[in-house]
A protein has these predicted regions:
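Short, well-structured active-site flanking segments
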Residues: 114-132, 218-221
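Flexible glycine/proline-enriched surface loops and loop-helix/loop-strand junctions
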Residues: 90-94, 137-142, 184-192
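A short, well-structured edge-of-sheet supersecondary motif
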Residues: 55-93, 269
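Active-site SXXK
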Residues: 97-121, 134, 277
Length: 329
């Protein structure tokens, strides 16, 4: 992990959460250079918290979901970002690539804001309306329109760029959008698992962490993206569980559902605490699993012992287990 030499400056950007000075123009050709020059935040793969991990394992056991995870039917990543420069991660099957239905629409969202920032597309009122419909209502027609406008290869290049690394073959994949959300031909399936719309919980969590720390395009774009992720119109999975059992939670989310595949992802804020939760399931009961799971994850974040770890020494944090080797080509 690189030294965090400019963390104070980065924190000021995070806390401001608003417009900053004139941004350096970032084009596709300069993404890697921008990543090298950007403030260095902790890497999530180096931030596993053994207390949070033990708690997650216990919650899955109590919910009867540990065996589902062992069989690869459930994958979860939880990140406590209450103190954003000290993220703490717990996960099960974090790097398992799964079909994610509409969840990868967040990749189209990123692509649109990046392309507008690069001066290659206008972020006008119509575009913002389509993006909001794509995220809040999970509109397939809006997603297809925006994917075709931004460009399939552009989105894929952004996801695989050195700046974002949200799809990395060495990390067993990640976010992938290789087909329109319509009855149209596949553009390109993901190189490892042949999925049209795929994700791993860990890379989805990284997407949200990058957003929370002002690193998706720029601070202004991050703020606008968060607005679009807020006020979800579909009230199932994470939203259902939190609305019933943890009212007052601010939820910024994107979910996905198709057949037996259920996925949800969110930034959740309440009472001064903030966390990222991502869960993906392949089971007819997966939607119910996720509604119950989010309440258990919320309990972990608000557990007094977890709160006590906010500013403890780093001896409770360790590198995550490396992802499985990608399948042979």
């Amino acid at each position: 992990m690189k030294a965090i030499s400019t963390l104070t400056l980065a924190m000021s950007v995070f806390l401001a959460g608003a417009a900053q000075g004139a941004d350096e123009a970032v084009t596709m050709a300069s993404l890697a250079m921008h990543a090298e020059a950007a403030p260095q935040w902790p890497r999530l793969e180096m931030s596993e918290d053994h207390h949070l991990q033990d708690g997650l394992d216990a919650k899955l056991e109590n919910l009867g979901l540990a065996s589902k995870a062992q069989r690869g039917r459930l994958a979860v990543t939880l990140v406590d970002v209450t103190v954003p420069d000290r993220p703490r991660v717990a996960s099960v099957n974090a790097h398992q690539m799964m079909y994610a239905a509409s969840l990868p629409k967040i990749a189209i969202l990123l692509g649109a804001f990046q392309k507008a920032h690069d001066g290659e597309m206008e972020m006008d009122a119509e575009t913002e309306t389509l993006l909001t419909q794509m995220i809040r209502r999970s509109s397939n027609s809006a997603a297809t329109t925006m994917l075709e406008r931004v460009g399939y290869s552009y989105v894929a290049d952004i996801l695989r760029s050195d700046r974002y690394e949200l799809y990395d073959e060495d990390m067993n994949g990640g976010l992938w959008v290789g087909k329109p959300y319509a009855k149209k031909a596949v553009w390109q399936r993901d190189p490892l698992y042949n999925l049209s719309h795929g994700a791993t919980p860990f890379e989805v969590a990284r997407f949200y962490f990058l957003r929370e720390t002002g690193r998706l395009v720029d601070a202004k774009s991050c703020a606008r993206m968060k607005e679009m992720l807020g006020d979800p119109a579909i009230k199932h999975k994470f939203v259902a569980g939190l609305n019933i059992h943890r009212p007052g939670s601010a939820i910024y989310r994107k979910s996905g559902t198709w057949s037996t595949y259920h996925a949800d992802s969110a930034i959740v804020e309440r009472d001064g605490r903030r966390y990222i939760a991502v869960a993906m399931a392949n089971d007819p009961a997966g939607g119910r699993w996720l509604s119950e799971l989010i309440v258990a994850l919320d309990d972990l974040i608000f557990d007094p012992e977890n709160i006590a770890h906010d500013r403890m020494a780093d001896d409770h944090v360790r590198p995550m287990v490396p992802p499985p080797r990608p399948p042979a080509s």
